[in-house]
Structures are given as C-alpha cells and as structure tokens.
C-alpha cells in the first residue's frame, strides 16, 4: 500500500512540475529600413513567459540602421528614456541611469538578422511601452505597447 502511495505522489508531483514551467510563447516582430515595427501591440497574461523575436528585414548596413526592442516599466516616459540615452552608443543607446526602467531588451539586429529575448510578462496588469533605441528610430515611430492583463 505504501508503494502505491509513493507512486501516486510521484505522478502528481511530476504533473504539477511540468505544468508549472510552461514554455515561453513566441512573438515575432519585424523591423525594416522605414523604421517601423511590423507589430505595435502585444497582449500577454500577467506572469506569462514570452520569447520576443525581432527579425530585421532591412538592407541598410547595421552601423546605419540597426533595430532592437526594449520593453519599459509602467510610468517610464519613452521620450525621456530615449533622450537620456542618445549619446550612449556603447550601451545600445540606453543611459546607465535609466537601465532600471528596462524590463527586457533584445540586442541590435542588422539586415537579415534575428535576435530574441526571453522574459516573463510583468505581474501587474497595464500598458508597458516598447521602443527601438537606435538613434532617431523612436522619433520616426518605432514604438509599441505590451498590454498585460
């Protein structure tokens, strides 16, 4: 009888472990030389694991036209965040003083490259801005919103 209980407990435990670690949901965003994201709104559940893939479909050299996705905390002013990082090329145009506002970020992608970041959607429902930090891209409209419910 004890063996049956142990086996039953192991079966229950293995089932709860496999459901506790859900694989991340993949979301793909394209970017181009026109400084636009292919997707500007992402919806996620609070605490949901996300794999965010950025596909650069441009043709201009990476030194002139790279793209990334930086997800910011609620309450962060994207325009001020971008302005603060304009001279920080070595940190992907993210001011060290503003790095605590970043929830997740991809590396820069050049033409034909795909980059990604895996993160957990915030636990707090709300609207989280995301931006491209490459110089001039946010101002050209390269921005969007992660909506967490």
Say what each PLM segment does.
Residues 6-16:
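Bacterial N-terminal signal peptides
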Residues 43, 60, 119-123:
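Short, flexible loop/turn segments at beta-strand junctions in immunoglobulin-like
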Residues 54-59:
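Short amphipathic, basic-aromatic surface patches that mediate peripheral association
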Residues 100-149:
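Extracellular/periplasmic metallocenter environments
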Residues 22-50:
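N-terminal edge beta-strand
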């Amino acid at each position: 009888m004890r063996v049956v209980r142990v086996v039953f407990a192991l079966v229950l435990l293995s089932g709860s472990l496999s459901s506790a670690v859900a694989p991340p949901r993949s979301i793909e965003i394209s970017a181009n030389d026109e400084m636009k994201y292919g997707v500007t709104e992402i919806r996620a559940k609070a605490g949901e694991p996300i794999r965010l893939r950025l596909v650069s479909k441009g043709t201009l050299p990476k030194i002139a036209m790279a793209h990334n996705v930086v997800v910011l905390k609620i309450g962060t002013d994207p325009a001020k965040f971008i302005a603060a990082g304009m001279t920080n090329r070595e940190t992907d145009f993210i001011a060290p003083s503003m790095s605590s506002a970043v929830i997740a970020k991809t590396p820069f992608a050049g033409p034909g490259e795909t980059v990604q970041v895996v993160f957990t959607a915030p636990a707090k429902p709300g609207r989280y801005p995301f931006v491209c930090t490459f110089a001039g891209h946010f101002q050209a409209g390269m921005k969007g919103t992660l909506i967490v419910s």
